[in-house]
A protein has these predicted regions:
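Beta-lactam-recognizing serine transpeptidase/beta-lactamase-like catalytic domain environment
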Residues: 3-186
Length: 186
């Protein structure tokens, strides 16, 4: 949901105080339900609370209202964050991220609403962690580094690693400041 909120803020289709009706906590798309974890939903809440409460219906409404018929703009915004690029950690079996695009054959009417709250995409925990670390690192997403061993305390041996930047700027400084504050309330 963090990536979704960043996309919406970057494209200025939402502001944090804008009120969204999460209905009764349930939305129907082509016979499939999107539900909030809270039975009965949250009613009308602002975008900041949608993020804080992790409202699936709220995120879906923000994204479908803003990007219906413009799905490519939303997906391209995610791609611009760098989340569709492999990290290449050298770990055997590490999958490439999969973020569907409207130009692909498997794109359908459920793709946009599902993606808005993290369904229908494939990211490993390390890919997600790298993204969150990028937010904590003032927008700079860095490739994780793994140590094979460490030296004993007091030893003169130490390791120095070159920082490998995946994306120097996930989003604008304005959006970064907003989402950093939002994350403090989660």
């Amino acid at each position: 949901k963090l990536m979704t909120m960043i996309a919406a803020l970057e494209d200025q289709v939402i502001d944090t105080l804008q009120m969204i009706d999460t209905e009764n906590g349930e939305l129907d798309f082509y016979g499939f339900k999107v539900r909030d974890s809270r039975k009965g939903g949250y009613g009308k809440i602002n975008a900041m609370d949608i993020f804080r409460l992790s409202s699936n219906t709220g995120m879906v409404k923000i994204i479908t209202d803003a990007y219906e018929g413009k799905s490519e703009k939303f997906v391209n915004r995610l791609y611009n964050m760098g989340v569709n690029n492999p990290i290449d950690l050298g770990i055997k079996g590490e999958p490439n991220p999969k973020i569907p695009h409207p130009s692909e054959n498997d794109w359908n009417g459920l793709s946009l609403p599902w993606m808005s709250y993290g369904y229908g995409i494939l990211l490993t925990p390390l890919q997600i962690l790298s993204f969150y670390n990028g937010i904590a690192n003032n927008g700079e997403m860095v490739k994780p580094t793994f140590l094979e061993s460490t030296s004993k305390l007091g030893s003169t041996n130490f390791y120095e690693f070159k920082k490998e930047i995946i994306n120097p700027s996930i989003c604008s400084k304005k959006t970064l400041s907003i989402v950093q504050k939002m994350l403090l309330d989660v």
